[in-house]
C-alpha cells in the first residue's frame, strides 16, 4: 500500500494528528493503532468520574462512524511492538504494516519512584481505562487505600476513591499539596477542605511498600518508621 500514514497511539495527540492529516489530505490511507479495547477517549476523565459509574464509552472523542467517514482505519486492541525505519514497517500483535509517513503518539508511561516493593501486584497506576477496572476489582467500599502523590491526579484519584467508600490516605513528599500548580496558602485551603474525609501527610519520605501477597494487606512504610496498612496503593507521581 503506497502513500500510507500510520499513527501509533490514539490519545489526544494521535487524534489531532489524524484530524490534521485529513484537513490537507483526504485520500491517502491512514491507519491508527491503539493497544486499548475502547474507542479513543478523553484520558483526563479517568480521574474525574465516579468509580461506581465508570464507563469510558461516555467520553469517546469520535464515534466509529467518524473514523469510517474519514477513512481512518482504526485498529483497536492491537499494540505495536516494533518499528523498522529501514523497511518502513511497523509490527503489531496481528501483523506487519508498511508506512510512508509515521507518527508516534504514544505519550508517556507513569513514573514509578525507586521504592522497595513498588512493583507489587497491590500497587496501581492510572493511565488507561483498564487500570480503573483493575482498581475496582480490589477496591471494595470499605477498603483502605494509600495514594502516593499529592498533585492533581493524586488528589482527584483520592477523592473518587473516598466517594466510592474507601478510606484514603495521601502521602506527598513536598511540603504542601499541588506544589506545581498553586502556592502554599491555596494548598492549605484545599487540605483544610479534605479534613475529615481524606488523611493527608506532606513532607514525608516513603521507604517501602510491603505487600507479601495479594491475599495479605499491604503496608506503606515511611523513612521515619510510621506505617500505613492498606488494601491497595495508587502511585500518582507523574
Model regions and ranges:
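Rossmann-like dinucleotide-binding cores of NAD(P)H-dependent redox enzymes
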Residues: 144, 153-208
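Glycine-rich Rossmann-fold phosphate-binding loop(s) that bind the pyrophosphate
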Residues: 9-13, 127, 148-151
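Hydrophobic alpha-helical segments typical of transmembrane helices
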Residues: 17, 45, 62-63, 76, ...
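Beta1-alpha1 glycine-rich phosphate/pyrophosphate-binding loop at the start
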Residues: 2-73, 160-182
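FAD-binding core/adjacent interface of flavoenzyme oxidoreductases
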Residues: 1-6, 60-146, 203-209, 219-237
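Short, glycine/charged-enriched secondary-structure capping and boundary segments
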Residues: 21-23, 45-48, 89-90, 116-120, ...
